[in-house]
């Protein structure tokens, strides 16, 4: 009986570890959270899971973390990762707020229900060794290194703050200036914070493009930190809204092209099909040459090629940039990034915020009448005067108009939008209105995603925020 009880206990521990790993996407290559995609010995995967259990220390199978120090220069750093993974495993079981991806999501009750696809977990195991092999250029910093770099996180060195993190300017001991993103401990429970940290780190591991922020390293010592390449011109938001000087059109147009190239890469050319979910002016950094860099992958999701979209709850993102289908139904695919990109283009054209702080009016609602009339003089930032290229402005206006269409199917993909912005379709394309494009659209889309219903939902949500 004692032997049988012990086996039952081991089986239960194994199942708990499997559940936690699946929650974090560390085992499931088909899951939108399984972003690390590291190579490991599949034959040892089951024993690796067992050896991770705190109740199975006597197992003769070696832990998957046992060789960490061979890869990481400091055993202290490796132990930090071990403790972090163990802290997740020991937490009480709870599911993260991610609804499984659906093969096809109903927008109305009139549609027939479709079966949810079964997800098959892979046999690969997440290991610190495999993780560090993925990006050997990344440094694993100690807390003391980051504290010294930021004058112990002096508030004067804070260059940004969000709901879940603070960003500090720092200077490393080698003289390199970096931006240090410090995840706030009070924002989320420890289990969820660590999960989000690993998920974001895993997504960044697959990103390598000039128009994406570059990670220098990270730290799990006394908190969770990302160390990023410093952008001397700050964010696009600070240049558009926080400066008295007018950002010249040449730079604005270059930034628009850079963001488009970066998003096209994430959606089409990246090893993983990545949906950013939080494209906004404050998440676009500008390097020394005003090259746009997409940053903050904290809300990003990746989708396998054969899955049309993902459905999430609760809805996360920034009010004013949320696409109707995401805001109203939780649908996540490339088209929600396209919508947010359209809002961003309107901000670049007008220097108005996504939501006006005084009137609380959406820039989309404000700009649509001018876009429909092609009224350039009414929509362009008056500070620009006539100091812009009319053809380029026309391209950006047309692109923005297509991006913010309330029906997702009517929005072009980023590959197409890059062509439009660069004028690769010829001048005739610029004369074509977004509404003139012929495209098959399901009737339920037209019913559920009318402009009026979306605006009503926006007003309702805005009212809730103000209460």
Swiss-Prot record:
- A Pfam entry, by short name: PK_Tyr_Ser-Thr
Chain intervals with Basic and acidic residues compositional bias = 1-24
InterPro entries attached here?
A: Kinase-like_dom_sf, Prot_kinase_dom, Protein_kinase_ATP_BS, RBK1/2/STUNTED, Ser-Thr/Tyr_kinase_cat_dom, Ser/Thr_kinase_AS
Catalytic site: 278
GO terms classed as biological process: cellular response to ethylene stimulus; defense response to fungus; defense response to other organism
EC number(s) of the enzyme?
A: 2.7.11.1
What reaction gets catalysed by this protein? Answer: L-seryl-[protein] + ATP = O-phospho-L-seryl-[protein] + ADP + H(+); L-threonyl-[protein] + ATP = O-phospho-L-threonyl-[protein] + ADP + H(+)
Enumerate composition-biased segments (Low complexity): 40-71
Domain Protein kinase span(s) in chain numbering:
153-430
Give the residue ranges for region: Disordered: 1-73
Transcription among keywords: no
**Listed name of the protein:** Receptor-like cytosolic serine/threonine-protein kinase RBK1
Question: What organism, scientifically named, is this protein from?
Answer: Arabidopsis thaliana (Mouse-ear cress)
Which classification does the entry list for the species?
Answer: Eukaryota, Viridiplantae, Streptophyta, Embryophyta, Tracheophyta
- Please name the gene that encodes this protein: RBK1
